Swiss-Prot record:
Species of provenance: Mus musculus (Mouse)
Stretches for region Disordered: 18-120
Name recorded for this polypeptide: Mucin-like protein 2
Compartments in which it is found: Secreted, Extracellular space
TM region(s), chain numbering: none
Glycosites: 89
Cellular component annotations (GO), alphabetically ordered: extracellular region
Bias (Acidic residues) ranges: 56-67
């Protein structure tokens, strides 16, 4: 039982580390593309979105081991983030939204991906803490 818990802990740690790398790389790459004035920012974003989707699919196995309380907490945090994002969008300047519609869509997609990533990190971290507590008790 302890071996299984350690194995799951190792897998969760690996996923957590892999979640952090695409975020760092996509931010640096899209910043470079924006400063150069090239249209490669959308390609970079698409690549990072694909990476996040791959992490989502591989993470679903690990999330089965996490209690539904943690999942509910992550969902509530996601809903709060979405509400904050809607509030931020509603207070923005409407003329700037009309002038750069494509850029706003890309930014919104990127922020949604980051929100999902942060929620996954929260769920994984709480699962890791529970596993640590379990191993210390056992």
């Amino acid at each position: 039982m302890k071996f299984l818990a350690l194995l799951v802990l190792l897998g969760v740690s690996t996923i957590l580390v892999s979640c952090q790398d695409p975020e760092t790389n996509s931010t640096e790459t899209s910043g470079t593309a924006d400063s150069a004035g090239e249209n490669t920012g959308s390609e970079t974003q698409a690549d990072s979105t694909d990476q996040n989707q791959e992490v989502d699919s591989s993470d679903s196995v690990e999330e089965e081991n996490v209690n539904t309380d943690d999942t509910n907490t992550a969902n509530e945090a996601s809903e709060e983030d979405n509400k904050e994002e809607l509030n931020d969008n509603s207070t923005g300047d409407n003329t700037s939204d009309q002038n750069s519609g494509v850029d706003n869509t890309e930014t919104e997609d990127e922020s949604n991906a980051k929100t999902k990533l942060e929620n996954m990190k929260t769920v994984i971290k709480s699962g890791v803490e529970k596993l640590k507590n379990f191993l210390q008790r056992g």
